[in-house]
Amino acid sequence: MARYVLVILFLTTECFVENRTINYCAADVSPKTHRHKLHPSATMPSSDPENPSRPRLEASPELMEELAAASELLEKANPIEVIRWASERFKKRLTMATAFGPEGCLILHWLSSVAPDTFVFNLETGYQFKETLELRDRIRDRYGITVSYESPETTVEEYERRHGGPLYRTDPATCCGDRKIVVIERVLSNFDAWMSGIRRDQSPDRADAPIVGWDKKFGVVKISPLANWTKSQVWDLILQENVPYNPLHDKGYVSIGCWPCTRAITDGEDERAGRWSGSEKTECGLHLRD
């Protein structure tokens, strides 16, 4: 159930979730820009501290109904409200994955004001650009959020030795599966919900992404605060708020992943054309449509 009351410049939204009332006040999507104190590094919970025996969420009809209602309500909310809802709803059972793309950096900009103790992680495959890895330190210095590197069990050297060379050249799907999917499955097993920076206009696989929905692949709730935003909206606010971003974006790299499978694109090419160029592969498997 939702009720909207417009008072001067503020929109108050009242929604009922799990018999709790959550109020939002929306004014500006831009929190004050300032340097935040360094927060204690968020740790990955092995269980709910308030209820150690608490099981993970199940895709019950009641939960599906709740998520659908929340997604419909938050479709017209600004991203800060979405993040606030997610933090209030899932608390320590909420995490965020980021590849330090522009959308992820913008969400971190907001997260530092709304829920700075959220556990944030990056899938460190061993093949990321040095510019991407250096951005982690800039994010930490600016916002006080230390992004945790989550890596595969085998190093790049061990992995390539096991497969007789770089697997990304011959079987990029398996490489992504081993060095990304297996890792995120391990991380998300400790949480009930995760946030991502995907946008609907990035690719056909993402075109139907809800603001809030059930992620069948990983068995958790998935929140995408920027699902209904455009590339220009993201970059306008990044430049306006001086949000740190990967300098490779200034060199024609629009979508940035592992260096062996990423190239700069030219005018007129699809936003993700620089990923796995020359193959039919367009996604690593994290955000494939059900």
Please identify what each model-predicted range represents.
Residues 6, 10-11, 15, 35-290:
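Nucleotide-activated chemistry modules centered on ATP-dependent adenylation/adenylyltransferase
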Residues 2, 12-13, 21, 26-27, ...:
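Ala/Thr-enriched low-complexity intrinsically disordered regions
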